[in-house]
């Protein structure tokens, strides 16, 4: 078709997108769900992946991070952190929305829960896109967000032979 452009991004462009593109929730949910559906180790899981509408999108570092997360050293660092909040490395699908008291909690409470409120570890159990290798991190910061973005990028590259 005349005027139709078929363009495949380079690996560098795709990695840039995984690390720095700020996406709307529906886009991110779809991308992470598709990755999960392709990398899921069916031999390890007794349950099937649920339909996409059964998952909630969670900001691992919350949008309201200043309330309970470590402060940034400078205004420039704060701006960089805020830019990372909506990137793929900081977003995850989970089986249920977190309770509001946990959603904006510090990293330890957010991942493990507090009292009778479950955290990410509970609601992400069995999901390869937010595995224990990330939930066991002592901190969740911009470097870990970038690390996870690279992990997701590499999975996408392997799946779609990019």
Where are these regions (language model features)?
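Intrinsically disordered, low-complexity N-proximal targeting/linker segments that flank membranes
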Residues: 1-84, 88, 93
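Long, cytosolic, alpha-helical-rich C-terminal regions that act as interaction/scaffolding modules
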Residues: 83-87, 91-162
């Amino acid at each position: 078709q005349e005027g139709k452009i078929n363009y495949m991004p380079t690996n560098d462009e795709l990695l840039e997108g995984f690390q720095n593109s700020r996406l709307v929730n529906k886009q991110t949910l779809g991308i992470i769900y598709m990755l999960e559906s392709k990398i899921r180790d069916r031999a390890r899981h007794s349950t099937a992946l649920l339909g996409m509408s059964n998952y909630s999108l969670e900001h691992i570092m919350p949008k309201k991070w200043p309330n309970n997360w470590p402060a940034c050293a400078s205004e420039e660092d704060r701006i960089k952190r805020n830019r990372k909040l909506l990137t793929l490395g900081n977003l995850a699908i989970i089986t249920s929305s977190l309770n509001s008291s946990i959603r904006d909690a510090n990293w330890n409470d957010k991942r493990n829960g507090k009292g009778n409120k479950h955290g990410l570890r509970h609601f992400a159990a069995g999901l390869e896109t937010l595995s224990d290798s990330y939930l066991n991190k002592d901190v969740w910061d911009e470097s870990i967000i970038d690390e996870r973005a690279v992990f997701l990028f590499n999975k996408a590259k392997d799946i779609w032979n990019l």
